[in-house]
């Protein structure tokens, strides 16, 4: 659902960039106020894992694919402010290194995927968890519904931006984007629930209540588990991800505005590959690009969080 350059008009680009900057600024302030320094590696790990997971497109109906957004996963495990920071790091990296999402459309993508999606996920998760209870079943129910709602919210926000830009009629694009992402959102929900279920059993302190939670101990083990899973995804799964168009690309092809997409700058690692390695091994080219991206995502998110974190704080507000 990454909006490329060329889809949105100047007014929409400017307004979404302003809203995204406002949301990110508030999130950075919250992180500065409430993030314990010992949780910094988890933000880097979340960014790296979400980057790796977003490389894995899964097929859905009507020749379309989807991939994990990861906003709900980050919101559940990190809280909304830290989730916004981690998601923004991923989107910035994807735009600059992989041309996945336009440079001029970065504000729109950050607003949709890094601000709206985590905030909706957190609100839904908190509300459902209060109703369903803090048992594992209640947590997973809240997680799944929050993940589905976050995907729908991001899709409808994107649809509104396309309509506001005059690309396609409001009713047409809202129905098309909403319809396809209702299905993609189910995949988002299932994948997020599975990951949270594993985390809740292995590291239950990471699935914190929606208010205040004690900072988890032994972060080295959590980071090691997450890093191993991220590497496994890139090595074993990423090269076999679906090549079908994602929801936005499918809608663009269906309604004839796919040709409007332009690249504001060439990608350093086009199509998530290290080009010199493609001839020797396409699999290795994809794995190498994924590894580079995951490391950079970890480094960017870790650096920002480390600069903002509060030394000595032992609790984190979700």
Annotate each language-model stretch with its function.
Residues 112-154, 158:
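Short helix-perturbing small/polar motifs within transmembrane alpha-helices
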Residues 58-117:
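Alpha-helical membrane segments and adjacent membrane-interface helices in multi-pass membrane proteins
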Residues 1, 270-303:
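Individual transmembrane alpha-helix segments
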Residues 2-9, 14-73:
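Hydrophobic transmembrane alpha-helices
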Residues 1-13, 36, 60-65, 105-108, ...:
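Interfacial loop-to-helix junctions that mark the boundaries of transmembrane helices
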Residues 16-29, 49-54, 119-122, 147-159, ...:
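Hydrophobic core segments of alpha-helical transmembrane domains in multi-pass membrane transport
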Residues 141-145, 176-179, 212-229:
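Membrane-water interface at loop-to-transmembrane-helix junctions
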Residues 156, 243-274:
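Juxtamembrane non-transmembrane "cap" segments at the membrane-aqueous interface
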């Amino acid at each position: 659902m990454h909006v490329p350059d060329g889809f949105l008009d100047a007014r929409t680009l400017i307004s979404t960039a302003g809203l995204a900057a406002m949301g990110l600024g508030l999130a950075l302030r919250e992180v500065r106020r409430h993030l314990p320094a010992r949780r910094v590696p988890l933000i880097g790990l979340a960014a790296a894992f979400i980057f790796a997971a977003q490389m894995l497109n899964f097929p859905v109906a009507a020749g379309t694919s989807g991939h994990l957004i990861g906003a709900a996963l980050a919101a559940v495990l990190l809280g909304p402010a830290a989730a916004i920071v981690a998601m923004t790091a991923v989107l910035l990296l994807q735009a600059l290194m992989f041309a996945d999402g336009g440079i001029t459309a970065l504000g729109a993508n950050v607003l949709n995927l890094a601000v709206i999606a985590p905030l909706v996920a957190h609100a839904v998760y908190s509300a459902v968890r209060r109703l369903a209870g803090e048992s594992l079943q209640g947590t997973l129910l809240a997680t799944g519904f929050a993940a589905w709602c976050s995907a729908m919210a991001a899709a409808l926000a994107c649809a509104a931006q396309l309509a506001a830009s005059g690309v396609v009629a409001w009713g047409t694009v809202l129905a098309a984007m909403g319809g396809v992402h209702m299905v993609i959102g189910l995949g988002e929900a299932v994948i997020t629930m599975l990951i949270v279920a594993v985390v809740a059993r292995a590291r239950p302190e990471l699935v914190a209540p929606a208010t205040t939670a004690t900072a988890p101990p032994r972060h080295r083990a959590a980071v090691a588990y997450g890093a191993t899973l991220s590497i496994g995804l890139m090595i074993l799964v990423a090269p076999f991800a679906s090549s079908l168009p994602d929801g936005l690309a499918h809608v663009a092809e269906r309604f004839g505005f796919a040709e409007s997409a332009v690249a504001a700058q060439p990608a350093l690692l086009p199509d998530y590959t290290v080009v010199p390695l493609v001839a020797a091994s396409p699999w290795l080219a994809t794995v190498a690009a994924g590894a580079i991206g995951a490391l950079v995502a970890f480094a960017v998110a870790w650096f920002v969080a480390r600069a903002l974190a509060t030394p000595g704080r032992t609790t984190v507000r979700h």
